[in-house]
Amino acid sequence: MIRVIQRVVVIVCMVLQAQTALAEGLQEIAVALAYPRKEVIAKIAERKGGDVVSALILERALIRKRADRAQGSPCEQVEDSLKSGCLLLVSANAISDGRFDDLRGIFATLDTRAKNQLFQLVPVALFEKLAALSPTRLISQAETNIALSTESEGFLQDSTKPVVDIEINGQKVSGALDTGASVTLISEQDARQLELTPLHYDAEIGTYYRAGKVKAALYQIKELKIGNTQMRDVVVLVGGQMTLIGLDMISRFDSLYLSPERIAINLSAHELASLEKECRARVFLNSDFMRFNQFLYFIAKVDGKSTIVALDSGYSGDYLATAIMPQGAVRDITSSGVVNDARGAAYEQPYSAEVEVEAGNKTIRMPAIFSGTRKLPAPYVLGWRGFSHYHLVYNVKSARACLI
């Protein structure tokens, strides 16, 4: 069987700095955002106002919902060594939620040091551009159920795809609901037929499965509808050859259920509670400060060794991708070796081996694919085919997620 891998994971490369270039307090927070270990969180929480910062980190990581939702800046009582980091987290949340009007108020509270640290992570031009925009508004939100089929345009496929209908400014396009995409991306082809407002800011996107960069640009959509969720004044990137609904947009739903048979958005309270009772393994969010790079992951044992496995519904080609050549791997002769992503088609030489994945007392044997041309976000990535064994339940509103 010829198998074509079609995949892009979005990373926005907007002058991001290495963690080692950050001030000490920011380094601690950056480490905790990547992998929130108890000892790191505890060290932050011990300091003045550290409980506020740790609560922001834990909520971002999908570990615990913040209890304190008082009006005003949550960072007012935070000590100086953590204050800049706290304000950066709040700024990032505002950008991710589309609360661009809040950015102006946050910026007014920054001292010179905090501004300098902010602009290490976000270019001044981008911050000013976003702060001047109208905030994204949620117009309506209701439950949506999408049954997925292996039939496409009269032909049978060997698996379903997480494709949903999207309405942009009244015109319909299709896009992948992609848990492996940091941000939402509209393809150049789709953008040409839509009435989008250019924001005159250029960026770059990169791919995990073909290491490289593609030029993109910032646009604002007047009206966006995904299922029964309707929003106005939504900021997206335009570039490349694939339209993807990324984690920034997914995080604006109340909840999400994702399996090869069905996609459900904004589930009823009863169904969501019922699904959460079946949870086998916790799912967390890894992110940088500004959420320009972020991915969902779970902890599993692969061939008996504990490791991180990212969740990527947009990676449709395989069950499991690996950044490490598996023991006993052989050339994968079932693959065409063709990879399609935002930069077009390319050829790779994949190798495969059967591995044992154990998560939440559920053990599955599945093929793991290795290719030297890929730059993965984690040691292993569960692709769309792997979702047949592990379904995602994402309770966005309560800041928790799991696999069933």
Language model feature labels by segment:
Residues 22-404:
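Pepsin/retropepsin-fold aspartyl endopeptidases
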Residues 1-9:
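Bacterial N-terminal signal peptides that target proteins for export
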Residues 8-17:
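Bacterial N-terminal signal peptides
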